[in-house]
UniProtKB/Swiss-Prot annotation:
Species for this entry: Caenorhabditis elegans
GO molecular function per UniProt: zinc ion binding
Biased composition range(s): Polar residues: 179-191, 295-321
Region (Disordered): 161-191, 278-342
Residue spans of biased composition, Basic and acidic residues class: 322-342
Name of protein: Endoplasmic reticulum junction formation protein lunapark-1
Length: 342
């Protein structure tokens, strides 16, 4: 009969009850974890005290050969008791934490259903007050849990988001159809922006991949000095953003552009100038850069130095002079031949 005459509770009172139960369950989880650590600490300390008393008693009572056997037995027994007690204590507290986390998940799901019910049934002002009260609490708890540094949105954006939540389809259609008026200043600013700033306006730096290093990797890093602990970070001088890492030998000679602000950070030192060397010669006088070697060059020069067949006056005069010289050289040879014959 009580169910027939019972009045339905309002969503606001139900949300308050669920929020209180969620806070209670979170506090209970914290107390369970702290009590787990405290119990293990007191358990270990009590075993150490009992073991030290037992070792002193055996040292004073038993003789030399029996003393060592009893001490070894006590040590083995203490190790077994420690492991068994630790297993039992951790199992008990893990069961308690699983039970409370199950209740917490049920309470959170109930809270989300109640918030959806508030959005559907209540008026705009009442629903907005309830959502601002309970959704803010949920957002703050998630931020504290994840240790994130996110900025809260402005009140104007929050009001527009809440109004869009309760808007009808016709209102949403009108909102889409009416374009936002952009002034000339915004157009000029977008034109004056460089492509780098247009590309990196909403850029988020990539989180580095953290690999799990084994003992062998740590030994190699210690001897080779090639791990992340042996590198220098590239920090921007303007916005102090991390832009990667480099080896200590390359660090003074590296210039880089910042990922966040686009500032060009020059190198601290100028690198050593490497002298230009001539590429080595390959087979058949061909160099590695595709040029022709000295053997073919000399061949071409010899071909260019062949006697010319031009019939110019200078060439004919040179030819006549050469002919007269050859005749003068031939005359004494004939005279010598005649004298020898006679």
């Amino acid at each position: 009969m009580g169910n027939l005459f019972s009045r339905n509770k309002s969503p606001a009172t139900e949300l308050e009850r669920v929020a209180l139960s969620i806070d209670d369950l979170k506090k209970r989880l914290q107390t369970i974890s702290s009590s787990n650590t405290n119990t293990l600490y007191y358990y270990y300390m009590s075993i150490v005290v009992i073991l030290s008393i037992a070792m002193a008693h055996t040292w004073l009572r038993f003789e030399d050969p029996q003393k060592t056997y009893v001490a070894c037995a006590l040590m083995l027994g203490a190790i077994g008791i420690v492991l068994a007690g630790r297993y039992v204590i951790n199992g008990f507290f893990s069961w308690r934490t699983n039970r409370t986390t199950q209740k917490l998940e049920n309470a959170i799901s109930q809270k989300t259903t109640l918030l959806d019910l508030v959005k559907e049934t209540l008026k705009f002002k009442e629903a907005k007050e309830i959502l601002d009260r309970y959704e803010k609490i949920e957002q703050n708890t998630t931020i504290d849990k994840n240790d994130s540094t996110l900025k809260s949105p402005s009140p104007i954006k929050k009001l527009t988001a809440d109004s869009s939540m309760f808007a009808t389809p016709k209102q949403e259609q009108k909102r889409v159809e009416t374009p936002t008026a952009q002034g000339p200043n915004s157009a000029m600013n977008s034109m004056n922006m460089t492509p780098y700033h247009q590309r990196n306006r909403n850029a988020v730096p990539i989180r580095p991949f953290l690999r799990q290093t084994t003992a062998f990797d740590r030994v190699l890093d210690y001897f080779m000095s090639d791990g992340p602990n042996c590198r220098n970070a590239l920090i921007c001088s303007i916005c102090h953003t991390h832009n990667g890492m480099s080896t200590p030998a390359e660090y003074p000679y590296i210039s880089f552009r910042c990922f966040e602000c686009g500032h060009l950070n020059p190198a601290k030192k100028m690198g050593p100038q490497i002298p230009l060397t001539r590429p080595p010669m390959g087979p058949k006088g061909i160099q590695h850069n595709g040029r022709v070697g000295p053997s073919e060059n000399t061949h071409n020069m010899m071909e260019n130095q062949k006697p010319s067949t031009d019939l110019t006056p200078s060439a004919s005069q040179n030819g006549s002079e050469k002919g007269s010289d050859s005749e003068n050289e031939k005359v004494p040879e004939s005279k010598t031949m005649e004298t020898e014959f006679h």
